[in-house]
């Protein structure tokens, strides 16, 4: 939750990060140097301007260079999604189609598991920040976790910087190529009282 980026009524995406079955992260430089594409924006635009526009809206870089951010996420994480390896597509594989599938799957998950709407359904909405002051209006970690558990049956991990909400991590397992379903978190939270402030 970055108050400087994305729609005022939506969480933006950081990525979809595959882990090993025992919860360990995969190599930091990705899993397939042959597919370490650097022109993600061009690949997506060539396939779907609608997807590209949605990525610009819901997956912006907080450093201002979306293509660099998407390339980083693809190389480090996308190349490690085993179900997106070209051999999984069979004889009908078209070069780079797995890139489009990776990003479109993530945006579908973002829409299906809409954190903003799930929190709002439990009465948890962003509050107006007070300039130069510590946030007074806060929610508890238990409130956040309960709201999202009510929506999807499992709790997330909630991450803060100080008291300010930074990220909500959802954990999934996958059946086949794209049947993702939420599961209990394997990580830890870094919040107690949460300042969930309006975007500006």
Residue ranges and their predicted role:
Residues 1-54:
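An N-terminal structural lobe/cap that precedes and organizes the functional/catalytic core
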Residues 56-200:
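C-terminal, well-folded lobe of enzymatic/effector domains
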